[in-house]
Swiss-Prot record:
It comes from Sinorhizobium fredii (strain NBRC 101917 / NGR234). The lineage of its organism: Bacteria, Pseudomonadati, Pseudomonadota, Alphaproteobacteria, Hyphomicrobiales. This is Putative uncharacterized transketolase family protein y4mN. Its cofactor is thiamine diphosphate. Keywords: Plasmid, Thiamine pyrophosphate. InterPro entries: PDH/Transketolase, THDP-binding, Transketo_C/PFOR_II, Transketolase-like_Pyr-bd, Transketolase_C. Binds 1 thiamine pyrophosphate per subunit. The keyword Cytoplasm does not apply. Belongs to the transketolase family.
């Protein structure tokens, strides 16, 4: 029988073994059950910044609660602007405020900033080199709501935009450190945001965020995992599991995607005999992996092998995050299995 063009292919239809999904399952935190977290780190950090800098204002496209800007709204109601579901207006308003000497912090979902408002960010903010900070929740595969909400290609879109700095923090402490750092940077910034109860990961490594700098969190002789955002948390977990299997894995955290810390990346990749793996919460097209690969190709540095772990060049399914992360290979278990397979080649 000929299938209707509106009928989903069989391989995309859920089977009886799949759990029934609830709304709470689809917006669950990325933190593990026993993992320490900190609530709304961006909202608290921006509120603290505003206490010291009266230029700071916050703008939302009807998503203050879901980008943690509600904390700022409660602390500074006279400096909060609700623009409604109008992302183009959101960006143009921020541009106008920046021209008047304010420092606007714009929040929405990453899909809406990259897909709906790209032209306005490009021409009204980036071309004019205005001091606007665009902070966007739900980067990559951090929601189960499907392609309409999963910003799997945002870095690919924004990497080519001149003047724009791109940040992908790993945890709550790094978000708190990144806010004053990018406030001190004059010019447009795009920051991917982990929201809600955000894991605490980096404090035990004595880590301090520096704009434009990559940091080696863990050394390893067998393989080097280069990562950003939540994938640094996964990379550290994977490195510990690999250690139990006799595999020594290093982790290089790259929170600034643009400008890329090429010197540190090349220095680490130059060490002989190591498999280099780039792990990212983003499509393998146009993100950190391809940025690192291009850096290596422009240099004389050649690692023993180079591989990517990331999301496929496809529109992703809806569902519970643990299920989706396993399905698309970015869970800790899948990362460990993939690296072991590559090392056995």
């Amino acid at each position: 029988m000929r299938r209707s063009k509106y009928e989903r292919p069989a391989h995309l239809i859920g089977n009886a073994e799949r759990p029934r999904l609830t709304t709470s399952a689809m917006i669950a935190s990325i933190a593990g059950a026993d993992q320490p977290t900190r609530p709304a780190p961006f909202g608290h950090a921006l509120s603290a910044l505003a206490e010291k800098d009266d230029r700071v204002v916050g703008l939302s496209a009807d998503l203050a609660k879901y980008t943690d800007l509600h904390v700022f709204r409660a602390a500074h109601p006279d400096r909060f602007y609700q623009m409604g579901m109008a992302e183009q207006l959101l960006m143009m308003s921020a541009a106008g405020m920046a021209r008047e000497g304010l420092q606007p912090w714009v929040t929405t979902y990453a899909v809406f900033a990259s897909r709906r408002a790209y032209d306005f960010i490009c021409l009204a903010i980036a071309e004019e080199m205005l001091d606007v900070k665009v902070v966007c929740a739900l980067p990559g595969l951090t929601t189960g709501y499907g392609p309409s909400h999963q910003a799997t290609e945002d870095i690919a879109m924004f990497r080519g935009m001149p003047n724009l700095t791109i940040i992908d923090p790993c945890d709550a402490s790094e978000i708190e450190q990144a806010v004053p750092a990018i406030a001190a940077h004059e010019g447009p910034v795009y920051m991917r945001l982990l929201r809600g109860n955000v894991p605490l990961v980096l404090e035990e490594y004595g880590y301090r965020f520096e704009l434009g700098k990559a940091k080696l969190l863990r050394d390893g002789r067998d393989t080097l995992i280069i990562s950003s955002g939540l994938m640094t948390m996964r990379a550290l977990e994977a490195a510990e599991e690999l250690r139990k299997n006799g595999i020594d894995a290093g982790v290089l955290h790259v929170p600034t995607i643009k400008p890329l810390d090429e010197a540190t990346i090349l220095a680490e990749c130059a060490r002989q005999g190591r498999l280099v793996v780039v792990a990212e919460n983003h499509t393998v097209i146009g993100g950190l992996g391809e940025a690192v690969a291009a850096t290596l190709m422009r240099s004389a540095v050649r690692p023993a092998a180079f591989r990517q772990i990331g999301l496929p060049d496809a529109f992703l399914e809806a569902g519970a995050l643990p299920t989706l992360h396993d399905m698309y290979g970015i869970s800790t278990t899948k990362i460990v299995a993939q690296i072991k397979e590559w090392l056995d080649e």
